[in-house]
Amino acid sequence: MKETKFELYELKPFIIDAVHRLGFYEPTDIQKRLIPAVLKKESVIGQSQTGTGKTHAYLLPLLNKIDPAKDVVQVVITAPTRELANQIYQEALKITQGEEGSQIRSKCFIGGTDKQKSIDKLKIQPHLVVGTPGRIADLIKEQALSVHKAESLVIDEADLMLDMGFLADVDYIGSRMPEDLQMLVFSATIPEKLKPFLKKYMENPKYAHVEPKQVTAAKIEHILIPSKHRDKDKLLFDIMSHLNPYLGIVFANTKNTADHIAQYLTGKGMKIGLLHGGLTPRERKKVMKQINDLEFTYIIATDLAARGIDIKGVSHVINYELPDDLDFYVHRVGRTARAGSSGQAMTIYELTDEDALVRLEKMGIEFEYLELEKGEWKKGDDRQRRKKRKKTPNEADEIAHRLVKKPKKVKPGYKKKMSYEMEKIKKKQRRNQSKKRK
């Protein structure tokens, strides 16, 4: 068996076996910086984008330090969405295969499932708990789940926890754990409103900020399509009808807009998946199954509903509108061009979007321009073409400039007088040109 660079961390044999099975050879940047700190039981803040290997940066060392001989909860991992919680749980199960690893009991508790069944599962306490904050907090309140001896708490996607209003539940969970708690916080951004919470639980945490090499994947084509005061719904339908995606996601900023788009497209005969925060757990589960079964070519989604969900095979992302928070643009387009594949991110833009587009360009995003004319894709005009266009002076302009000189001593209104004199000369030049042609 080929040795990997993970052997340097003195991890248990079952962890090293898992690393080989998963095909890992060299730790990612965030793993190099955080695995040693987590093994030393230090609290950490990891700021990184999706796809940097952050999940294994905490799973590998935390599973390594669990003692299966102790029948108590030792690690609690919280995630803002059911889908993300389940993904983390599945990764944990992959690591704990084999004779030694299988002694670690892991359980996943998420909202939208039967609470009594969850309570029944807790007659024997697991070593590792993964779940959504609301459900974990409920189980602690019911005295079904005991976390008072758990040494480590993970808060994944902390900025999304804040956005979705889950911080109070996380605070409750943390308050029921030991005072010398090891807290591991992972977030794409660290908003100001999150800082008081971090200060409450963390003293001199190790901080690792992994800057993405590129804001978005190299193989994403960023395409701008002007609305030009056209009916936006019809334009969207036309765009979707002239693409051939494996799977496409249309992003809207609000639940109401997503509902409106879905209703319009359904009326046009399209079979559409819909993902937003207004769905019941049962509806959401059904849509996710339909997506995984490839029943849809397109999904309409809002930002918060789509965060934390791993949807495979997305070839196209369409922004019905630009997000208010431009970080979400990066999250949206990051749905496509994964694992080295290519993808297209199309944005319908208005004239009022100019400021946002300039800011995205300053982040390093280069846009192409396309137009859909009579059912055919054509290269569009650069929205900056008017600003970039240089005025070419004609002969009359040049003569007028030469003949009308700026006075040495200027008086109020001189520009107007100069302009008037130049216009007189230009008219005379045009009359002379006209006579010559006759």
Curated annotation (Swiss-Prot):
Induction: Induced by cold shock. In rich medium highest expression in logarithmic growth, expression decreases and then disappears in stationary phase (at protein level). Protein level not increased at 16 degrees Celsius. Not detected in minimal medium (at protein level). Residues 235-385 form the Helicase C-terminal domain. The lineage of its organism: Bacteria, Bacillati, Bacillota, Bacilli, Bacillales. Residues 392-401 have a biased composition (Basic and acidic residues). ATP binds at S48, Q49, T50, G51, T52, G53, K54, T55. It comes from Bacillus subtilis (strain 168). PROSITE patterns: HELICASE_ATP_BIND_1 (PS51192), HELICASE_CTER (PS51194), Q_MOTIF (PS51195). Residues 35-208 form the Helicase ATP-binding domain. GO terms for biological process: response to cold; ribosome biogenesis; RNA catabolic process. Interacts with CspB when cells are transcriptionally active. May interact with RNA helicases CshA and DbpA (DeaD), may be a component of a possible RNA degradosome complex composed of rny, rnja, rnjb, pnp, pfkA and eno (although rnjA and rnjB's presence is unclear). Specifically interacts with pnp and rny. SMART domains: DEXDc, HELICc. A motif (DEAD box) lies at residues 156-159. Belongs to the DEAD box helicase family. GO terms for molecular function: ATP binding; ATP hydrolysis activity; RNA binding; RNA helicase activity; RNA strand annealing activity. This is DEAD-box ATP-dependent RNA helicase CshB. The keyword Iron does not apply. Its main location: cytoplasm. It catalyses: ATP + H2O = ADP + phosphate + H(+). Keywords: ATP-binding, Cytoplasm, Helicase, Hydrolase, Nucleotide-binding, Ribosome biogenesis, RNA-binding, Stress response. Disruption phenotype: No difference in growth at 37 or 15 degrees Celsius, decreased growth at 16 degrees Celsius. The presence of CshA or CshB is essential for viability; in a cshA disruption mutant further depletion of cshB stops growth after 1 cell duplication. Others show a quadruple disruption of all RNA helicases (cshA, cshB, deaD, yfmL) was not lethal at 37 degrees Celsius, although both 50S and 70S ribosomes are decreased, but growth stops at 16 degrees. A double cshB-cspB disruption mutant cannot be made. A double cshB-cspD mutant grows slowly at 15 degrees Celsius. Decreased amounts of 70S ribosomes. It holds the Pfam family Helicase_C. A motif (Q motif) lies at residues 4-32. Residues 402-417, 425-438 have a biased composition (Basic residues). One of its GO terms (cellular component) is cytosol. Its EC number is 3.6.4.13. The keyword RNA-binding applies. Residues 380-438 are annotated as: Disordered. It is found in: Cytoplasm, Nucleoid. The gene is cshB.
